[in-house]
A protein has these predicted regions:
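A short, Lys/Arg-rich alpha-helix, primarily the initiator
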Residues: 1-14
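Short alpha-helical DNA-recognition segment
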Residues: 16-34
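DNA major-groove recognition helix of helix-turn-helix/homeodomain DNA-binding modules
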Residues: 45-60
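Charged, helix-prone or intrinsically disordered regulatory segments positioned adjacent to compact structured domains
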Residues: 57-136
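Helix-turn-helix repeat elements of alpha-solenoid scaffolds
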Residues: 85-100, 128-139, 168-180, 209-220, ...
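Amphipathic alpha-helical segments of tetratricopeptide repeats
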Residues: 97-104, 139-146, 179-187, 219-231, ...
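Residue register of alpha-helical TPR repeats
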Residues: 113-116, 153, 157, 197, ...
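Structural register within alpha-helical repeat arrays
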Residues: 120-121, 158-162, 202, 242
Length: 303
């Protein structure tokens, strides 16, 4: 199926609908028949009504039209949305390569250009620890979007991945805007996992600024949302960060318990990337005490 008419016919027959049912409130049956036979194209408002009659989104229609195969752009966005931590450098590099291939054919695609730049910025921050150069790489994105009266879903997807590259004040401002926008999209997209990640990552800034009590506040919010909605991976990451904060606050035994719990849960879930990320973060924040902590993901814990 490579055209609109054949795809409409395939969907209609698959749903056991008559042509009259398919075109209800959209156009006459005779005109609908011409669309299925690829003789005319429907106007956008009538096409939308036909899709409503099919209980189908435009995105799904295009997916079916391509024989249930994602387009190169959709594949990039799928991989981009699955990135959990900035430490997944192999995945970041792979998606950058796919962006480069796509942009050779579609050089004016602003969104994919933003995705590519955001991933390059993340790599500079993660591998080279060069936040200045990373900010230079992505600054144009925020410069453009900061002037927008509304942030849309693709804007959210990019900004949630790069806000940590900016200076603290700018980063916190970006997160606040993203949280507001996420609430608007909660009935259309799965926003809670993103909200959890934003709170956990903003806590990182606060830890670096030694604002431990405020960091703990956002971490507790993350843990609550994660537990209520069964986001176990995000739960692990938030619990680990809670342990770090408690340790910084002088509650060393309690902090160790939470860090040990995060490591153990990640191990049980067989999430090796998350386990490695948690270890790296503990080592980064508590490097001087790492031997004294004697953490081990194999240690049994009381959940």
């Amino acid at each position: 199926m490579q055209n609109v008419g054949d795809t409409l016919k395939f969907i209609r027959k698959s749903k056991s609908l008559t042509q009259k049912e398919a075109c209800s409130e959209a156009l006459s049956r005779s005109n609908y028949q011409k669309i299925e036979n690829n003789k005319i194209m429907p106007s956008i408002d009538r096409f939308i009504q036909i899709l409503l009659n099919f209980n189908m989104t435009l995105e799904e229609f295009e997916f079916v039209k391509r024989d249930f195969t994602p387009s190169p752009k959709e594949n990039i966005l799928y991989l981009y949305s699955k990135i959990l931590t900035s430490s997944e450098t192999d995945i970041l590099t792979d998606v950058i390569s796919k962006c480069e291939d796509y942009l050779k054919e579609h050089p004016t695609d602003i969104f994919i250009s933003d995705v590519k730049a955001s991933l390059e910025g993340i790599l500079l921050a993660e591998k080279e620890h060069d936040f200045k150069l990373a900010r230079e790489k992505v600054a144009y994105i925020w410069e453009r979007l900061s002037k927008s009266g509304e942030l849309f879903w693709n804007d959210i997807m990019v900004l949630r991945n790069i806000f940590f590259i900016f200076e603290n004040e700018t980063a916190q401002h970006i997160v606040n805007r993203l949280i507001v926008q996420l609430k608007k999209y909660r009935y259309l997209y799965p926003t809670l996992s993103i909200e959890i990640s934003l709170h956990v990552n903003r806590a990182t800034y606060l830890i670096l600024d030694e604002k431990y009590e405020l960091a703990l506040y956002f971490i507790e919010k993350s843990i609550k949302i994660a537990k209520q909605n069964h986001y176990y991976i995000q739960f692990c990451m938030a619990v680990a960060k809670k342990g770090i904060v408690l340790y910084k606050l002088g509650e060393k035994e309690a902090g160790k318990v939470f860090m040990q719990r995060a490591l153990r849960v990640a191990k049980v879930l067989e999430e090796e990337r998350i386990l490695s990320g948690i270890k790296d973060e503990i080592n980064y924040f508590l490097h001087d005490d790492i031997e004294q902590l004697s953490l081990n993901e194999a240690t049994k814990i009381n959940l």
